Amino acid sequence: MRKIEEQMNMAIRSRKNWSGSNTTVRCFKENGVTTEVNVLLHGNCIAWFDTASNDFNISSAGWETVTTKSRLNAILEEFAPDRRVFQKNWQ
């Protein structure tokens, strides 16, 4: 896992806003409590976490690049270790 992805995961876990290079973690609060955490790559939301239910969703946001898959796999490694994103035959 890349250093930037380790920092991204740390920000998600600690529910802190963070930005590094092309990746941003944005936390949304309601009444002082973090309710949602979004991960953006080049300004496109690729993951969002509901902190109340501990559910999360991922998306390539239409950009099926090596970097997008790397960020998504770093998130999955941390929060759903039995899952992976991969591409076969460009699909």
Locations of regions flagged by a protein language model:
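Terminal leader/tail segments of proteins
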Residues: 1-91
